[in-house]
Amino acid sequence: MHCPFCNQTDTKVIDSRLVADGVQVRRRRECQACHERFTTFETAELLMPKVIKQDGTREPFDEEKLRNGLQRALEKRPVSVEAIETALHNVRHYLQALGEREIKSLVIGEKVMEELQNLDQVAYVRFASVYRSFQDISEFRAEIDRLQKKPDETA
């Protein structure tokens, strides 16, 4: 690492510690040439995969699109902004952990539905109705029945 004071490359790490809930490393460094000290922060650069749409086209992952979809489903529901941000983080982390360069939009949609199911079942049904293109009330009823049976299966 170049010293910001004298531009020499011979620096030594004096101290390292985790910050930002373990997502970042703070390093205290000392230049071996001019003996000035400075701080650096390191984070992992994880790239989001490209999204393969249902029609086969590819586009960059758009976090804003994901946020808007969650907010639309959760509109006028008693869910905190923090809970929404946690759900967004969970989806991003899941996609990064897959380690794929490209991922089908179907995988993202299913993960979003999983997160919504844990947050608010009404929002889940709203999202599912659009995502799965419900055509009539019987499809809503079937999804609600499935939701009601799910807790019994895990008990």
From Swiss-Prot:
- Superkingdom classification of source: Bacteria
Question: What does the entry comment about cofactor binding?
Answer: Binds 1 zinc ion.
User: Which positions fall inside the ATP-cone domain?
Assistant: 49-139
Q: Which UniProt keywords apply?
A: ATP-binding, DNA-binding, Metal-binding, Nucleotide-binding, Repressor, Transcription, Transcription regulation, Zinc, Zinc-finger
What is one Gene Ontology biological process annotated in the Swiss-Prot or TrEMBL record?
negative regulation of DNA-templated transcription
**unnamed zinc finger positions in the chain?**
3-34
Molecular function as annotated in GO: ATP binding; DNA binding; zinc ion binding
* Entries under Pfam families matching the protein: ATP-cone, Zn_ribbon_NrdR
**Cofactors:** Zn(2+)
The protein's role, per its UniProt record: Negatively regulates transcription of bacterial ribonucleotide reductase nrd genes and operons by binding to NrdR-boxes.
Checking PANTHER family in the record gives: TRANSCRIPTIONAL REPRESSOR NRDR
Membership in a protein family:
Belongs to the NrdR family.
- According to UniProt, the name of this protein is Transcriptional repressor NrdR
Lineage, highest ranks first: Bacteria, Pseudomonadati, Pseudomonadota, Gammaproteobacteria, Cellvibrionales
